[in-house]
């Protein structure tokens, strides 16, 4: 069994509890190439765990993994593995993300190696993220050729090399029970024919993305039978104007997961992206995880988006630890090196594991009042066994002077004033409600 399976739109653990992933991204896009070389170590993992997070989306860069056609850089993979071991040693889940932006360095982006960047000599102006997707013909043609599976310089199709890279990563982590799975490509771009995707492009998803994900899943399954694939729509889905056909209906096990990002231009469109994410997951009975959002230092924006996620019971991973939370992991995580305001906004109460189905959770930043409700019926329709507990995370940053807790339908079975509260529902309780207020411990 993997660390997390799924039942409908929910992640579930081996005991059947609903699990809510919540955490951050760490992607080392450029030199010094790995999180380890950039200074990410035990102190960083401890900071995340101590503030209530349980998941990290960790970048794997194909250009570093396969710097030459067919050659896996095992030193790079060894370094990624050491970082995974640090994270899992702090009981953090890890999602391995094959990351790119703007295709690769040869087109002024990051991710893909130069040998896999086939632009057919089109103009390559130095446009900046994210406008380079629509302003740089070389980026568009590089994606066209990747989706067409053109042969690389050695005559081997590009996606075959890419699948070899995915297989090497999956083989390395096939038995790691804290790895959540593999995301084949961050924010894929449709290529030259991108305009239909502004309002949703099901035909292009079926033509380009579905075969790609099937090919990557086959590569993973050749060495790893337990970890799911995280399927992400084309990047224009992020703006909330169109739907996705992903991940699609399936009876396969493990079930593919829907990975989405929320980067719309208004609060209403952010809500639209979230609602479309939930609707797609519920339609296909697949788990959903918002694997990126944020990329800002404004606590008010972070809190507004976090409130919107809570309203929809959506799990999330903030972008990004190494851009918005910590400035330099080679230095002590104190003072100006730590963005306390961002960390304060992110470290919110939430249920990390629910012995039943969560039906509501919220946190009022002004009053520091948190409310949480859940049903004691599981996603599979069966009653949750009382032997298991529900876990409520109450970070010290949210309650620096402690907290008081009122509960209807359950009892606290953990130590008083703990930051991680364990609840056991009462014998006849069909629903549990929790209200947390500041002060009291």
Positions of predicted regions on the chain:
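Active-site mouth of glycoside hydrolases
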Residues: 3-21, 25-228, 233-245
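Short polybasic amphipathic segments
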Residues: 8-13, 330-333, 405
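Substrate-binding cleft of secreted/luminal carbohydrate-active enzymes
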Residues: 22, 235, 263, 267-351
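Acidic (Asp/Glu)-rich catalytic clusters
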Residues: 46-52, 171-177, 246-257, 277-285, ...
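Structural detector of well-ordered beta-strand residues that form the stable sheet scaffold
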Residues: 95, 230, 257-259, 289, ...
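Aromatic- and acid-rich polysaccharide-binding/catalytic face
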Residues: 180, 186, 232-233, 244-269
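Surface beta-strand/loop "capping" patches
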Residues: 337-415
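C-terminal beta-strand-rich structural cap/linker in extracellular carbohydrate-active enzymes
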Residues: 348-357, 361, 417-441
């Amino acid at each position: 069994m993997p660390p997390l399976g799924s039942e409908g739109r929910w992640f579930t653990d081996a005991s059947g509890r609903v699990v809510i992933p919540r955490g951050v991204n760490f992607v080392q896009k450029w030199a010094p190439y790995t999180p380890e070389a950039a200074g990410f170590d035990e102190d960083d993992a401890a900071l995340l765990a101590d503030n209530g997070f349980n998941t990290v989306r960790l970048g794997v860069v194909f250009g570093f993994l396969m710097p030459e056609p067919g050659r896996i850089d095992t030193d790079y993979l060894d370094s990624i593995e050491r970082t995974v071991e640090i994270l899992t040693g702090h009981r953090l889940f890890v999602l391995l993300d094959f990351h790119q932006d703007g295709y690769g360095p040869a087109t002024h982006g990051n991710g893909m190696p130069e040998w896999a960047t086939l632009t057919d000599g089109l103009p390559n102006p130095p446009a900046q993220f994210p406008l380079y997707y629509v302003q740089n013909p070389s980026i568009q043609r590089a994606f066209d050729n990747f989706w067409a599976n053109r042969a690389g310089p050695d005559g081997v199709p590009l996606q075959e090399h890419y699948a070899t890279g995915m297989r090497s990563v999956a083989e390395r982590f096939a038995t790691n029970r804290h790895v959540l799975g593999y995301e084949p490509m961050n924010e894929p771009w449709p290529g030259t024919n991108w305009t239909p995707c502004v309002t949703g492009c099901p035909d292009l998803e079926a033509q380009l993305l579905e075969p790609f994900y099937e090919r990557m899943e086959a590569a993973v399954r050749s060495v790893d039978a337990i970890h799911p694939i995280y399927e992400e729509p084309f990047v224009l889905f992020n703006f909330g104007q169109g739907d996705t056909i992903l991940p699609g209906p399936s009876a396969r096990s493990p079930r593919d997961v829907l990975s989405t990002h929320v980067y719309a231009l208004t609060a209403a469109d952010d809500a639209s992206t979230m609602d479309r994410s939930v609707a797609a997951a519920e339609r296909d009975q697949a788990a959903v995880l918002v694997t990126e959002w944020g990329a800002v230092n404004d606590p008010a924006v972070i809190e507004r988006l976090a409130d919107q996620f809570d309203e929809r019971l959506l799990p999330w991973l903030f972008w990004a630890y190494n851009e918005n939370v910590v400035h330099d992991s080679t230095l002590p995580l104190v003072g100006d090196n730590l963005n306390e305001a961002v960390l304060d906004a992110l470290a919110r109460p939430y249920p990390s594991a629910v012995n039943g189905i969560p039906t509501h959770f919220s946190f009022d930043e002004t009053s520091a009042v948190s409310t949480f409700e859940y049903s004691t019926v599981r996603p599979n329709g069966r009653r949750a066994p009382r032997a298991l507990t529900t876990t409520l995370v109450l970070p010290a940053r949210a309650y620096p002077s402690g907290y008081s807790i009122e509960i209807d339908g359950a009892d606290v079975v953990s130590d008083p004033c703990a930051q991680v509260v364990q609840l056991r529902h009462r014998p006849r309780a069909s629903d549990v409600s929790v209200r947390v207020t500041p002060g009291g411990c």
